[in-house]
Amino acid sequence: LGYDLALLSMGGLQNQSEEQLLERTREVAKIIPVVGFYLQPSVGGRVLTYDFWRELANIENVFAIKMAPFNRYQTLDVVRAVCNSSRRNEIALYTGNDDNIIVDLLTEYEFNINGESVKKQIVGGLLGHWSVWAKTAVQYFEDIKAIRDNAQIDASWLSKAIEVTDANAAFFDPAHAFKGSIAGINEV
């Protein structure tokens, strides 16, 4: 096919059960490695359970998950589910949470899994937001990679995180349930 991985969206499949979505993923993963995709409900996605993400993480040939639920609790469900998987070291996590880009990339998630401390970081972003200022995005990402393992991170990164989220509002139209997202990206 000429592709390395397929980003497999669960969007538009609200009539499918979680088990049907998992079976669909298993079938696609037989053909090509998969990146699971958690898309926020306001733009066609749906809420998926912790159990769904734990099972998805256990599917051979799933190698990454893009998390874009725009919801901290749902993002935590995915990270915790992957950490609970025996395949946790094989699965890369990417943020698609344009409303929390910098914090997602700076955070090291840590969970107690059966008495063991398990840590996981988001390794990158697949973000519509960054499509409008790629040079700055790349610079921020390089800067974040250089500092995120430090014991202390300058507080200015928290201010920068809010500035990026504020800019996100201009692109994605959250005031109108993200209905202007495509037009916003195209305009900017």
Predicted regions span which residues?
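Catalytic alpha/beta core domains of metabolic enzymes, predominantly
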Residues: 30, 35, 40-182
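Scaffold signal of the M16-like zinc-metallopeptidase fold and its non-catalytic homologs
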Residues: 182-188
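Active-site beta->alpha loop and helix N-cap motifs at the rims of alpha/beta catalytic domains
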Residues: 1-53
